[in-house]
Amino acid sequence: MLLASALVFAAMVMPEAQAAVAVDVNASCTLNFQVETTTFDELDNISIPVNIYKVADIDVSGNYTAVDVFDDESLDLSSVSEGNAAEWEARAAAASVLAEGTEPTTTATITGGEAKVSNMNTGLYLVEAQDANSPYYTYSFSPYLISLPDNAYYKVDGATDDWIYNVTVGLKPEQTVRYGSLEIVKNLLVMNTIMGNDATFVFAVNVDEYPCDGTTDYTRYASVTYQELAAGAAETLVNNIPAGSTVTVSEVYTGSGYECLTGEQTQIIVADGEENAPVSVTFENTSDNTWNGGSGIENTFIADENGAFGDVDVTPSQKQN
């Protein structure tokens, strides 16, 4: 997961010796947030809640003293002039654990990629931008620590060691794909008892992954099986399809002794947890009064840890009416 900005860490590793100018501990500070939207332009249209916790007071020399729940041995602020980015990431993670269950000092909401918090007291702050969802992706942010005031001494060549009370930080998100499901409903109008008490119907699910270009990226198969036959509805759920993908579903095996009355159907996958999820398609079959035999198989497909689709998970249901 990417960190808020390398500049944030540089602001906090400034040795005491460089703080020739005293901190005005009574000054009012401003904290500005900017989200990188060049790579992920849909972030321009997403609101991102941010919780901000005061972790420590700062003295005139730039030293920090932890406050409240953050005054804990798990968070070492005694040597803030030392440590690389990884160590500051660990400090932020420790502060995030200590902040659990506590009320933030203040909050912000990033809209249009920007937010501004004014009239903040000086000190060291933990910033936690919350996960934000678009219809197709989740954007996550690592917690980080920021000093108010900040200092540009190590960030810009030739910069002075003046303290900066109007601070701007950039947020860089990690983007992960959201997944949705497809419900395939089989409505058996008339059962064919000639072929016994079981019937299996197989469906091809052609997936055009988001962003869609009108072509099939891969095809998966799912089945609905009736046991102890009774006319009515049964369904199966195909999981782990990228949200926003277009799926075209067709019945490729109509069951022994049955005919399909429904042509192929198309749906756009909605992310799990959203309104109208999961999307659904319905196929109707009726008996053709023949002795045609046959069988069906169901493949189970599961996405790997990198989001690649070797397979798509299928959850069958035996619900019948």
Regions found by a protein language model. Give the residues of each.
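Solvent-exposed loop/turn and edge beta-strand elements of beta-rich ligand-binding domains
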Residues: 1-321
